[in-house]
């Protein structure tokens, strides 16, 4: 599991809300 990618995607998802 690539936690850095998950963190980046998570930030993008939160900013998209």
Curated annotation (Swiss-Prot):
Entry annotated with the keyword Membrane: no
Q: Report, as the record phrases it, the tissue specificity of this protein.
A: Expressed by the venom gland. This peptide is also found on female cuticle and nest paper. The venom could be the source of these peptides, which could be spread all over the cuticle by the frequent grooming movements of the female wasps.
Enumerate the UniProt keywords alphabetically: Amidation, Antibiotic, Antimicrobial, Immunity, Innate immunity, Secreted
Give the Leucine amide positions (modified residues): 17
**Where would you say this protein principally sits, based on its record?**
secreted
GO terms of biological process kind: defense response to bacterium; innate immune response
Judging by the UniProt lineage, the source's domain of life is Eukaryota
What are the TM regions of this chain, as residue ranges? none
Q: Where in the cell is it found?
A: Secreted
Q: Which GO terms describe its cellular component?
A: extracellular region
User: What role does it play?
Assistant: Shows antimicrobial activity against the Gram-positive bacteria B.subtilis ATCC 6633 (MIC=2 ug/ml), and the Gram-negative bacteria E.coli JM109 (MIC=8 ug/ml).
Q: Which family does it belong to?
A: Belongs to the MCD family. Mastoparan subfamily.
**Protein name stated in the entry:** Dominulin-B
Source organism of this protein record: Polistes dominula
What is this organism's lineage?
A: Eukaryota, Metazoa, Ecdysozoa, Arthropoda, Hexapoda
């Amino acid at each position: 599991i690539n936690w850095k990618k998950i963190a980046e995607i998570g930030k993008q998802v939160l900013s998209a809300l």
